[in-house]
Regions:
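Short, structured "edge-of-domain" segments at secondary-structure transitions
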Residues: 1-260
Length: 260
């Protein structure tokens, strides 16, 4: 949250069973917490999106390497950030930048706005950064993902609501200066906390599937992992999240209880 970053070898990360204490990956400062991790190689370009709606781009090898117990380096020493800025989301650029025309990039903001652009719009970013998205007062970018037209978008809120809609029904914006359009109808004091992209696989609307259909559904099944602030989680089949129109109120994804 306070803008520190580092890179390390995947060899230092081991698979563990659920429910364990885990292993130290980074030492955090007071009231700081880890918000995002990526798996990249040293030649991958990484996009950094700021709370002010700007985007920066650097190669992964320029991020200082650190041990599991190190605190990392401040992003202010790596990117030309101003004092009031912080990074809200990071995203790896496809390794083959020539393929950027095949993909789109989706933005989601805390106030429920979404926007889709061609990834080509972000292939050339100078060292001083570029405008990625205009934001309303008190709004901020909470997630940025790469997607294709045959995938769906899922937005999740602080109060446990979710909405799923087709990416192809969200038009591609031609510029980077738009504020986007409504992705979900938020309740008072609620806000978007997560943006996810999943494959567009659905059950038949009449609910009747043949044996072959069911085998194919099982093979294509994906799962949504919902984790609460206090560390409780649940795994749900993506078939349980029906596809609706963008801008609706969504469904309950996880109960927002005092325990969670």
């Amino acid at each position: 949250l306070q803008g520190y970053i580092k890179r390390g070898s995947l060899k230092t990360v081991k698979i563990q069973k659920r429910g364990g204490k885990g292993k130290t990956g980074i030492t955090t400062r007071n009231e700081d917490s880890v918000v995002q991790t990526l798996s990249v190689n040293t030649h991958t370009s990484v996009l950094f999106f700021s709370t002010e709606g700007l985007v920066y781009k650097i190669k992964a090898w320029k991020i200082p390497e650190g041990s599991a117990s190190s605190k990392g380096k401040s992003l202010f020493n790596i990117l030309p950030l101003k004092n009031h800025q912080s990074i809200s989301s990071i995203m790896p650029f496809p390794e083959s930048e020539e393929d950027s025309s095949k993909y789109q990039i989706v933005f989601a903001t805390s106030k429920g706005k979404v926007r889709k652009n061609s990834l080509e719009d972000f292939s050339s970013i100078n060292t001083s950064g570029k405008i990625a998205m205009k934001l309303d007062t008190n709004d901020r970018i909470i997630g940025v993902k790469i997607c294709k037209d045959d995938q769906d978008i899922i937005l999740s809120t602080k109060f446990g609501k979710c909405i799923r809609f087709e990416s192809k029904k969200l038009r591609i914006f031609k510029g980077r200066s738009s504020k986007g359009i409504k992705g979900i109808e938020l309740a008072p004091n609620d806000e978007i906390v997560s943006l996810s992209i999943i494959d567009n696989n659905k059950m038949k609307k009449n609910g009747k599937n043949t044996k072959d259909d069911k085998s194919e559904l099982a093979a294509k099944q994906k799962f949504i992992l919902s984790i609460s602030e206090n560390g409780f989680g649940k795994k749900t089949s993506h078939y349980d999240y029906r596809t609706t129109n963008r801008g609706g109120k969504g469904i309950i994804g996880i109960i927002n209880s005092p325990r969670n």
